[in-house]
């Protein structure tokens, strides 16, 4: 079973070419939906998540020119760090807690100085309560909190009322890229209550060009390739063999298609960054946001598998081979892939590939190692070396999840017998 699931379905893709579209209605609906979830008044739509992030950083540097420091979780996506680097921010990295995957709150307070302008809250493994604790620190020191909600969209915590991820930060950023659970090829958004930022972006966006057609066309080709790869019979007899061989031979050309983060290189902003969101991405985002029943069903199917993996793996973690991230709330920590930490993930990956199982081998990186020689973030380094993810998308059945679990159990038994 192909581990990747593109949430944009082919029927929605085809509709773009045949349905009449009122973009005022489309944009209004997207903004209302994101505004309600994030509890923010202003919603701005961008060509990518990182572009929204870029303009927030430009705005906050202009607003506070004497404050030039930004704090990130060290375990992160390098493209986001590169945005701050290219804008000449002084970047500080905070290590993560090994048990939870969230930033070390004691360390983050030690990193804060009178020049700290921004803390980035990356929703990745955290609970809602974790986010509130970080918000309290940011508020105490009068620091802007940017909440990266790229991989947590629709996740929520419910006590008396629902609180969605994306509702904590002073600014919240969203991604509708091809691999996300709202998949629109490209696309992103910023939500905030800061009217001055709204005016700033409105003025800046006048200089943006239309989204580059060739860039969009390349993404459409990738979309088509991934859809073809997800056809079970083709995947089983053709594509799985190619993927397996690519892993064993470290074939970058193939691996970069299924792991976009491998394409990262440190560079200045490419021209396609400074573009508006395409009409195609707007339309796809609108259709998926409007289909609440499908989103809820996908959410629950993913949660079901996450709970199933956790309950079955929790008793297997009492060894040096496998560890689990602490999960307190399966609604808020409803991961797009189920993360586990394994000793020698190369060996683990090859063992599963030899049994017809594909897992997510690469997630994020220890960006402190990539961008700085100053901060040694050992837990982020361990996550980069140990973390893999099990598939949990709508087409993964409980029977197939059990097959994966059985092989993990066999791997641990074999490893302990050696």
Predicted segment positions?
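Active-site phosphate-binding strand-loop segment of PLP-dependent enzymes
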Residues: 99-203, 210, 393
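Active-site-adjacent capping/gating segments
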Residues: 159-169, 361-404
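Conserved PLP-anchoring active-site segment centered on the Schiff-base-forming lysine
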Residues: 56-113, 352
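Conserved glycine-rich beta-strand-loop-beta hairpin in the small C-terminal domain of fold type I
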Residues: 3, 14-16, 255, 259-295, ...
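Active-site PLP-lysine loop of aminotransferase-like
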Residues: 173-186, 200-214, 223-245
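Conserved PLP-binding active-site segment in aminotransferase class I/II-type PLP enzymes
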Residues: 1-66, 87, 139, 294, ...
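Conserved PLP-dependent catalytic core of the aminotransferase class-I/II
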Residues: 30, 210-213, 217, 257-265, ...
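Conserved PLP cofactor-binding pocket of PLP-dependent enzymes
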Residues: 212-216, 312, 325-329, 345-387, ...
